A protein has these predicted regions:
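N-terminal active-site segment of His-dependent metallophosphoesterases
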Residues: 1-23, 27
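His/acidic metal-ligating clusters that form di-metal
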Residues: 2, 101-104, 118-225
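Structural recognition of the beta-strand scaffold that forms the well-ordered cores
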Residues: 2-7, 12, 38-43, 48-50, ...
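Active-site environment of divalent metal-dependent phosphoester hydrolases
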Residues: 12-15, 41-53, 110-113, 160-166, ...
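Extended active-site neighborhood of metal-dependent phosphoesterases/phosphodiesterases
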Residues: 21-149, 263-267
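Short aromatic-enriched loop/helix-cap "lid" or pocket-rim segments at secondary-structure transitions
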Residues: 52-55, 116-117, 167-171, 253, ...
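Binuclear metal-dependent phosphoesterase catalytic core
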Residues: 89-91, 198-199, 206-214, 226-307
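Short, flexible loop/turn elements at secondary-structure junctions
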Residues: 92-94, 106-109, 162, 221, ...
């Protein structure tokens, strides 16, 4: 590929030192780095699970990965919630400016224990995008449009799903039957699997409404719910999942545990209106990778020159 993104949960809480945390990330990114593929990452809810022990938080991870020659992460927008919120622009084949935009968003980790003395029992207890992140997107999107004398089409990536992902599967806020899903398939052109509940935060961030208003983002894709692979056309914006690429996270269980290990491929074509030409799934099985393997401890990969 011309670019690769790891969309959160790059590592889990296993590292017991800063060195182990760096080694874990290095093991993930070396295949891209060694092939000279530009790459970036977003953060998921598990990337800081070992921070209390290792001292490595998201800001430290950004500083670390920026040492890699082919990494394109930046420190991100200043003064807003999260780490590494940024927009990467792709130049057109002819001329200057931005031909396409890749929005990388930090969807956070977990909801706090309480707000106003009330806990989150009975509600999804993951994190959510904050109003300052939504405002940053709106302002940055408008600035891109001014500089380019027209909207810049793009895709957005964050780890934790929006509430609208859940709505799309059933074409409903409340109804959740097989008949509702059948209606949703026809209405929203749904493709792929849903093997677990969507796990958004307890509050709707309003980011989908903001992107719908701006009209530039053609799709928003997430991870988090590792065994979902579906994509839906939800009122003109694709909402979808990419499957877990690594074999260490939970899978389907049993003989099919690793069946959905894979990645999502996105195609851009300047000859297509809006540049975005579609997406498809690629699974490990498609490449003859052994799906029966278990977790196999091994020596960590060496750091490239200039990375420590």
């Amino acid at each position: 590929p011309d670019f690769a993104l790891i969309n959160g949960d790059v590592i889990d809480g296993s590292p017991t030192s800063a060195l182990e945390a760096k080694q874990a990330i290095n093991n993930v990114v070396r295949p891209m780095e060694d092939r000279g593929i530009p790459w970036a990452l977003t953060f998921g809810n598990h990337d800081e699970d070992s921070s209390a022990v290792t001292g490595m938080d998201e800001s430290a991870y950004v500083d670390f990965v920026r040492q890699y020659r082919h990494n394109v992460n930046t420190p991100g927008a200043r003064g807003i919630t999260g780490t590494g919120n940024q927009v990467l622009t792709v130049r057109p084949s002819r001329g200057a400016g931005a031909g396409f935009a890749l929005w990388l968003l930090d969807s956070g980790r977990y909801a706090p224990e309480q707000i106003a003395g009330q806990d989150f029992e009975g509600y999804p207890d993951w994190d959510w995008l904050r109003p300052d992140q939504v405002q940053w997107y709106l302002e940055t999107s408008a600035a891109l449009e001014r500089r380019n004398r027209g909207p810049v089409p793009g895709l957005a990536f964050q780890h934790i799903a929006l509430w609208e992902h859940r709505f799309a599967w059933f074409a409903s806020v409340d109804a959740r039957t097989e008949e509702d899903h059948a209606r949703a398939v026809a209405k929203h052109s749904i493709e792929g699997e849903r093997n677990e509940e969507e796990c958004p935060g307890p509050f709707n961030s309003g980011m989908f409404a903001a992107m719908l208003h701006r009209g530039d983002v053609k799709g928003l894709f997430v991870g988090h719910d590792h065994i979902n692979t579906y994509v839906a056309d939800y009122y003109g914006i694709q909402l979808g999942y990419a499957p877990g690429a690594g074999f260490g996270a939970y899978g389907l269980g049993g003989a099919e545990d690793h069946r959905l290990r894979g990645a999502r491929v996105f195609r851009l074509d300047e000859g297509v209106d809006g540049v975005y030409a579609g997406t498809e799934l690629r699974f490990a099985a498609d490449y003859g990778i052994d799906l029966t393997v278990g977790v196999q401890p091994g020596e960590p990969a060496d750091f490239p020159d200039g990375v420590s």
